[in-house]
């Protein structure tokens, strides 16, 4: 159902006023895409917050944006702004995964609508709590599920929907995005903060697969270690073998020869589906859809959050049944000697 558009009409001059945004996590990896999306949609970034001060990226679009490295100062600014005739309307969140639900709650209680980077939350029960808070505050939270806006992926969904009724596709998903030792020292290397490999680098793929092929009927994990996860998903219209890794040693020979550090491929019934291009403007398109009342609400993220949560808590069964060919690769040790499964 289409949401009501935000009220930002200047009744005196009948012009659409720019919406005011606050950005939490301005120094993060994904923040530039949100900053660009706010600018590209003609809106205003009033204030930004991050514990780290490497935020020169603000200069290109919002040099007058207020910036704070202390949460208390940021909150003071936001609270004062809400009592003016030029209040904040939106809070965008680009922080580490484990903080998402807390900052979503902050934005809703502040009196704003919220846009949160994926994964929306780490656990399904967080979704229930946020839906209740939406009802209490009268404000809404949206998530970024940008693969649903990719032209080729939308075309694939339409092709499957219009294809033979009841056909079940055989799908192989491989995604290797090489990361160095820094990854393990950061919050991303801590399963309690990132959610693990499946959540941190794979949640958008699990959303895409279910959006196209239907809900998960069976969820099996074959291999899960500090740098990879491999498993099998049986969906309503697909049998999916997947392999996700951050270890460059897992890259296939053709990627290594081409000096590529990232390898992404999706095979459907033995035919490769290419969708590596076309990602650059998807955050801007996501913002356009959200601001037009067509964004992806909290409940739409539930299937993929449930899937990655089940994977995180699963006990790997080993190389049994329908496993991805790369699942056979030798396991690597944690670079710091830690044996905790991440």
Annotate each PLM feature:
Residues 181-251, 302-306:
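Rossmann-like dinucleotide-binding domain that binds NAD(P)(H)
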Residues 66-131:
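Beta-loop-alpha module in the N-terminal Rossmann-like domain of NAD(P)-dependent dehydrogenases
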Residues 98, 121-181:
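A contiguous active-site-proximal alpha/beta segment in oxidoreductase catalytic domains
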Residues 229-281:
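C-terminal substrate-binding/catalytic lobe of Rossmann-fold NAD(P)-dependent oxidoreductases
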């Amino acid at each position: 159902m289409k949401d009501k558009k935000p009220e930002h009409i200047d009744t005196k001059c009948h012009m659409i006023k720019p919406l005011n945004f606050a950005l939490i996590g301005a120094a993060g990896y994904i923040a530039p895409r949100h900053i660009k999306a706010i600018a590209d949609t003609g809106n205003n970034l009033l204030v930004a917050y991050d514990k780290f001060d490497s935020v020169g990226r603000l200069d290109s679009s919002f040099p007058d944006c207020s910036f704070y490295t202390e949460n208390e100062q940021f909150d003071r600014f936001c609270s004062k702004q809400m009592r003016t005739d030029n209040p904040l309307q939106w809070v965008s969140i680009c922080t580490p995964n484990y903080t998402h639900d807390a900052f979503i709650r902050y934005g809703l209680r502040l009196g704003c609508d919220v846009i949160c980077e994926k994964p929306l939350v780490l656990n399904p029960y967080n979704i229930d709590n946020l839906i209740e808070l939406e009802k209490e505050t009268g404000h809404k939270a949206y998530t970024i599920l940008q693969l649903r806006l990719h032209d080729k992926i939308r075309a694939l969904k339409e092709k499957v929907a219009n294809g033979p009724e009841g056909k079940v596709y055989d799908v192989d998903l491989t995604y290797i995005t090489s990361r160095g030792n820094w990854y393990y020292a950061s919050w991303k290397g801590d399963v309690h903060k990132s959610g693990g490999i499946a959540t941190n680098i794979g949640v958008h793929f699990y959303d895409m697969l279910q959006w196209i092929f239907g809900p998960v009927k069976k969820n099996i994990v074959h291999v899960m270690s500090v740098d990879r996860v491999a498993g099998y998903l049986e969906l309503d219209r697909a049998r999916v073998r997947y392999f996700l890794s951050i270890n460059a040693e897992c890259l296939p020979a053709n990627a290594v020869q081409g000096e590529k550090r990232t390898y992404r491929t999706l095979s459907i019934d033995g035919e490769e589906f290419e969708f590596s291009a076309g990602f650059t403007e998807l955050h801007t398109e996501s913002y356009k859809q959200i601001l037009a009342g067509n964004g992806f609400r909290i409940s739409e993220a539930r299937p993929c959050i449930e899937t990655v949560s089940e994977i995180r808590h699963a006990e790997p069964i080993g190389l049994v049944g329908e496993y991805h060919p790369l699942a056979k690769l030798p396991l690597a040790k944690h670079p710091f000697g830690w044996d905790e499964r991440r």
